[in-house]
Structure formats: C-alpha cells, structure tokens
C-alpha cells in the first residue's frame, strides 16, 4: 500500500502539468505587494549605459504564454513560477543591478499569430529590454524572425535578446540566422544522442526502430539517433508518424515486423501512450526509449485510462523498464532536498503555483535570467545582455541535477547539453542510470 500511495500522490501532483486548468498570470509588475526589502545600496553599473526597458528603479522584461489556457496547455504555470521567483528576488534581495525586475506577461493563446502580435506590443509599446522563456517551436518561429531582425532589412544588428527559449529545436543554435536567440532546455539532438549512447552501451546488438513526429521536433530525433548510433545497420526502421489511429497502428506493426527490439519514441504524450497501448494489444514489447518531453506520469495516466490509483499503476507497469532522460530535480523524488524546500517556500510565500515539474523549470530558467542580468550591470543594454548571456559558463541553477550545467558562448547558443539517463520504475519513480551524459 505504501507504493500505491506514493505512486498515486506523485502522479496527481505531476499531472498538474498536463491536466490542471491553466493558472492565469496577468501582465505587469512582478510584485503583487509592496517590497519589504531595504533600499539597495549602490552597485557597479548603476549609472552606466542602459537600453529600453531600464530605468533607475526597474528592468522590464517580456514574456508571452498561453496564460488563459485557451489552447489547453499547462504552460501558464511556468510564467507564474517566474513571477514568484522575481517577486522573491525583488523583496528579499533588492532586485538585480540595484533595480527591481518587472516581468510583463501577455497571453498569446499558444498561436504563432498571437505570439508575434503580443511580442511586438511588448517591444514597441512597452519597451521591454528583452524577451524570455518563449514556448513552442511553431509558435516561436515568426517571433524569433522578428526579434532577430525587427525591421526586416536583413541586418540583425538591431535585434532584441530572445533569452532562454523553452523549445528544443536544434535550429535555434544557428547563430548566423538567430544571433539574438539563446536556448535553455536541452536541444532535441542532444537528447537523441544521449538515448543513442544508451543504445550503443547497453543494447549494442539490438535492432532499432524510430517513431517520430513529422515536424522539427521529430526530425531532430531521427537525425540525432541515426548519426549517433555506432552500428548504422542496426537502425532497421525510421518513420515519421501519422497520429491517426489506423495509420499509427500500421506504422507500429511495420516497425515490429522489421524485428526492431528497441524503439525510440519522439512523440507527444498522447501519441506515445497510444503506441504503448497498441503495442501491448499486439504482444509487442521492445525496449522503449522515450523523449524527455514525455512526463512519465502523463504517459501513465493516458495508458491507464485515468487518475485513479489502479489506473496509474497500470500505466506505470506498462512503462516499467522504459528509458528516458532528465536534467532538473524532481518535484517528487527530490522533495526533501534543500533546493526543493526553498523552491516550495518561494512558491508559497510569493503567490506561485503548487510545486510541480513546471514550477521547478520556471524557477530554474528565472535563475539563469538573473545571472545574465547580474553580468550586464555595467551596461544594461540589449547588446550588453546578449553578451552577458553568451558569457555563461558552468552555471548551475539551484534546481538542476548535480553534474548538469549551462554553458554558452558567442558561437554556442545551446544552453544545456547534459542529461541524466533514467529508467522508469513500476511505482512511477525514476532510477538513475550511471552519471549524467554531456554531449557537445
């Protein structure tokens, strides 16, 4: 019963990242109440050059997200967690560079048109210094084009910092096309290569299949696995997936018929769950390797058919032994660790959401933003902020796993390229497999 209770509690909390109603986050000041911090003492750079969005008392940043939940995403939790962390920073630490951070957040309804429109408002009307934490590759594509070349003349010198985007498409690392865009989450090529390394080290004689979404996300995994697998002949099936049930089943059975004994899934959670259910019905049980974008708890809910304890346990039993990766502390497994206890205090004290995977992610990203601003105090301009971000080396957020670091440079805009391989257990916990793997 202890395992059942732990699994059920863990899953209910983790499911908040996929099924809870979105927590709306209004734009405007990150401080819902007056600051209790003492007036900050002068700091180096207080009187130095500064760009749009910077005054003697504040630094304005912008972010767009599906704040209303109209696209049925849980991502407003990220913005809410960032607001809470900045409020803590302003209240307890006096802000950064002697100024308070003011995050202006706009609802983009998780559409490219909405994201571009609200970003233009934040830049052209609200005059924010930089944008942070953009979500979704298709949603962010037109936004990135605008931020890297605002007037569309082909000259990127007048760009706006596009900091720590929350999409792992490898294309953001093209510093010629996107010189102002900085990644945050591990790029999908990195994750694919870490999974391929597991195949090389532990399943070296197994035939390999790949089922990937037919977009930039899936294409990165196809490329990454195919490039990193030592014995290319072992890749017997590589397919981009049509998610309709009939086509999905046919593609799964075609993968089975090639003799694939290990299958890499680069699919969103609902489609991945359908693959697991179809495979079980067909008696097909390869070793599964799953993109980190899939929450094990979300998969367990989808596979088991609900959130009741027995349904979740059924889902985790089907996932048992599957391989995935992680790079942040777990809101459940690491709940007693000092960084998670401090994270919980911040969320509870400063109006953040209930602690979950997305709040951990949000604070981790916010810490990287703050470190970037600290390094730009002598020149809080858009160019100064970009150069400060590019200077980050061996930066470890308090909520990153041990051994995971953020490393950037003028020619390297891939932030996190270290992942911890894990094996999903039947009680929903994650077993670390060796040390974190770094991929450059």
Regions found by a protein language model. Give the residues of each.
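Sec-dependent bacterial lipoprotein signal peptides
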Residues: 1-22
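Short, low-complexity, disordered segments immediately C-terminal to signal peptides
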Residues: 25-44
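Beta-alpha junction/loop-to-helix N-cap segments that form part of ligand/metal-binding clefts
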Residues: 29-32, 46-47, 73-80, 92-172, ...
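Extracytoplasmic "Venus flytrap"
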Residues: 43-58, 62-83, 108-112, 135-136, ...
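Hydrophobic alpha-helical segments within soluble ligand-binding/sensing domains
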Residues: 115, 183-207, 246-249, 272, ...
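Extracytoplasmic ligand/sensor domains, especially the bilobed periplasmic-binding protein
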Residues: 128-239, 287-321
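Extracellular/periplasmic periplasmic-binding protein-like sensory domains
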Residues: 280-363, 432, 436-438
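Segments of small-molecule ligand-sensing domains
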Residues: 349-359, 370-429
């Amino acid at each position: 019963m202890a395992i059942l209770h732990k699994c059920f509690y863990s899953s209910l909390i983790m499911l908040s990242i996929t099924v809870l109603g979105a927590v709306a986050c209004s734009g405007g000041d990150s401080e819902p109440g007056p600051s209790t911090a003492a007036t900050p003492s002068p700091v180096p750079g207080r009187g130095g050059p500064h760009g749009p969005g910077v005054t003697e008392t504040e630094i304005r940043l912008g972010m767009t997200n599906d704040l209303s939940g109209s696209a049925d995403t849980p991502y407003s939790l990220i913005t809410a967690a960032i607001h809470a962390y900045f409020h803590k920073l302003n209240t307890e630490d006096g802000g950064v560079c002697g100024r308070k951070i003011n995050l202006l957040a706009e609802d983009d309804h998780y559409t490219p048109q909405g994201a571009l429109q609200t970003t233009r408002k934040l830049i052209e009307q609200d005059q924010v210094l930089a944008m942070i934490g953009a979500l979704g590759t298709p949603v962010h594509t037109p936004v990135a084009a605008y931020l890297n070349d605002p007037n569309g003349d082909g000259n990127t010198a007048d760009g706006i910092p596009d900091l720590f985007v929350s999409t792992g498409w490898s294309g953001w690392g093209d510093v010629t096309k996107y010189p102002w865009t900085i990644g945050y989450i591990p790029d999908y090529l990195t994750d694919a290569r870490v999974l391929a390394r597991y195949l090389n080290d532990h399943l070296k004689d197994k035939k390999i299949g790949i089922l990937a979404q037919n977009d930039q996300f899936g294409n990165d995994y196809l490329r990454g696995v195919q490039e990193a697998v030592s014995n290319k002949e072992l890749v017997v099936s590589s397919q981009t997936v049509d998610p309709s049930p009939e086509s999905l089943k046919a593609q799964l059975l075609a993968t089975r018929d090639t003799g694939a004994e290990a299958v890499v899934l680069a699919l969103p959670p609902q489609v991945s769950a359908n693959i697991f259910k179809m495979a079980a019905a067909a008696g097909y049980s390869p070793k599964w390797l799953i993109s980190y974008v899939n929450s094990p708890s979300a998969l367990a809910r989808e596979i088991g058919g609900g959130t009741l304890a027995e349904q979740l346990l059924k889902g985790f039993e089907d996932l048992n032994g599957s391989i995935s990766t992680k790079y942040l502390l777990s809101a459940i497994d690491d709940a007693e660790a000092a960084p998670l206890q401090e994270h919980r205090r911040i969320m509870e004290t400063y109006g953040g959401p209930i602690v979950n995977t997305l709040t951990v992610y949000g604070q981790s990203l916010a810490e990287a933003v703050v470190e970037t601003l600290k390094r730009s105090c002598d020149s809080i301009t858009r160019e100064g902020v970009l150069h400060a971000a590019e200077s980050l080396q061996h930066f470890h957020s308090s909520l990153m796993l041990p051994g995971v670091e953020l490393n950037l440079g003028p020619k390297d805009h891939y932030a996190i390229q270290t992942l911890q391989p894990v094996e999903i257990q039947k009680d929903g916990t994650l077993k670390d497999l060796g040390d974190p793997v770094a991929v450059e």
